[in-house]
Amino acid sequence: MKKVVLAYSGGLDTSIIIPWLKENYGYEVIAMAADLGQGEELEPLHEKAIKSGASKLYIEDLQEEFVTDFIYPTLKAGAVYEGKYLLGTSFARPLIAQRLVEIAAKEGAVAIAHGATGKGNDQVRFELAVKALNPDLEIIAPWRIWDIKSREDAIDYAVERGIPVPVTKDRPYSMDRNVWHLSHEGGDLEDPWNEPKKDLYLLGVSPEDAPDEAEYLELDFEQGIPVSLNGEKLGPVQLLETLNEVGGKHGIGIVDMVENRLVGMKSRGVYETPGGTILYTAHQALEHLTLDRLTLHYKEQIALKYAELVYDGVWHSPLREALDAFVDVTQKNVTGTVRLKLYKGNCSLAGVKSPYSLYSEEFATFGRDGVYNQKDAEGFINLFGLPLKVRALMEKKSGLR
C-alpha cells in the first residue's frame, strides 16, 4: 500500500483529511505534528490521529530549530511584512515541510498532504518547500479537490465520522499557534469593521486591561542574537517563552491588519506576538547604534525583500541564502544591551549601549566642542547641493521659472 505523510495539527481541516485520503486514494496515512511551541495542545493528538484513521503519528519537537534556524535569521534581517506582520506562520511552514520530506524518505512514502486551503498562502509555502527539497514527491491538497466548500461543511463531515474538533459553528476562528505568535482569522474577524473581542486574546491582554505600572527589562545581544534577559543567560526557546509571558501581561504585540495575500486577495488577521515585538524593538535599537548610515539604509531595503521571500514561502532558495550572508556580515558588531519599557501595549526604548557604538557624544553635543569644525559644513553643502543649483540656473536661463 502506498503511503502519504500528512502535516497534522489535530484541528478541523487535518482531522477530516485523514479519512478523506483513505477513502479517496487508498493510501496509508502517516501523520506528523510539529511541536513549534503549542505545548499542551499536542498531548491528545496520538489518540485522536489513530482514531481518525492514521497508521501512526510523529510528534516532532522542532522548537529549538525553529527559533535558531528560522526566527533568528528573520529577526537579524529585520524582516516585517507590510510594516506590521512579524511572519509567525510564514516561516513555520518551510520547517514543517522540511520535516515532512524527511519522514517521507524514512517511511518510503510517495506523497505529502497538507490542510491548507486553496485561498491561502500556506498551500504555496508548503508546496514550494517540498518542490525545492524533493520534487519527486506527489503533493495532495484536499481543499483544492474535495466538495467541502466551507468550514461549516468541514464540521458536518467530521461529525458524520465521529471526529471531535475544537471548533463550533458559533466560534469558527482559525488559529495558528507557535512559540513566536498566535494568529486569529475567520468568523466575525472577516468584517474589518468589527473590533476584535477581548476574549480573543490568549497570549496576553488587551492594552487597556494591562497593569497601570510600567515594567523595565534588559536584553543582551551578541552579533544580532538575543542571549540573556535581565542578566540571566537563557536558551532560545526559554528566552522567547519568558518574553511572551512578560509582554503578554502588558498587552504588547497585538496586530490587527488587512494584508495582501500572495494568491491575490486581501485578508484580515489578528496576531499576538508579544515576545517577537520586544525582540524586534530591541534589535532595531541596537542596529541604529552600531550600524553606519549606508549599511543601515541598504539593509532596510534588504529587509523588505527578505520579508516578501518569507511570506511567499521561498525560504529554501539561493536568494534567501545569499541575503542571509549579507545580513550576517552586518550583524558582526550588533552586540550590546538594550533596556525597554513595557506599558499598556507600548514597548519603548529606555536605553541602549554597545562596545561597538558609533554614537559619539563629542561629535553630537550641542554644547561647546573642539572636535567638529562647523565651517566644514559649508563646503559639503555646496558640493551636495550643486546638482540642484545647476538645474535651477538652467530653468531660470531657459525661462522655465
UniProtKB/Swiss-Prot annotation:
Key words, A-Z: Amino-acid biosynthesis, Arginine biosynthesis, ATP-binding, Cytoplasm, Ligase, Nucleotide-binding
One CC-aspect GO term: cytoplasm
Residue sites binding L-citrulline per the record: 85, 90, 121, 125, 174, 183, 259, 271
Subcellular location as annotated: Cytoplasm
Location (main, coarse): cytoplasm
Disulfide links within the chain: none
Superkingdom of origin: Bacteria
TM segment ranges: none
Amino acids binding L-aspartate: 117, 121-122
Keyword Nucleotide-binding attributed: yes
Residue positions binding ATP: 7-15, 34, 115
Pathway membership: Amino-acid biosynthesis; L-arginine biosynthesis; L-arginine from L-ornithine and carbamoyl phosphate: step 2/3
Gene3D superfamilies: Argininosuccinate synthetase, chain A, domain 2, HUPs, Single helix bin
Biological process terms in GO annotation: argininosuccinate metabolic process; L-arginine biosynthetic process; urea cycle
UniProt enzyme class: ligase
A GO molecular-function descriptor: ATP binding
Its EC number(s): 6.3.4.5
CDD domains from the UniProt entry: ASS
Reaction(s) catalysed by this chain's protein: L-citrulline + L-aspartate + ATP = 2-(N(omega)-L-arginino)succinate + AMP + diphosphate + H(+)
Family per record: Belongs to the argininosuccinate synthase family. Type 1 subfamily.
Complex and partners: Homotetramer.
Matches recorded under PANTHER family: ARGININOSUCCINATE SYNTHASE
Protein name: Argininosuccinate synthase
Natural source organism: Desulfitobacterium hafniense (strain DSM 10664 / DCB-2)
Gene: argG
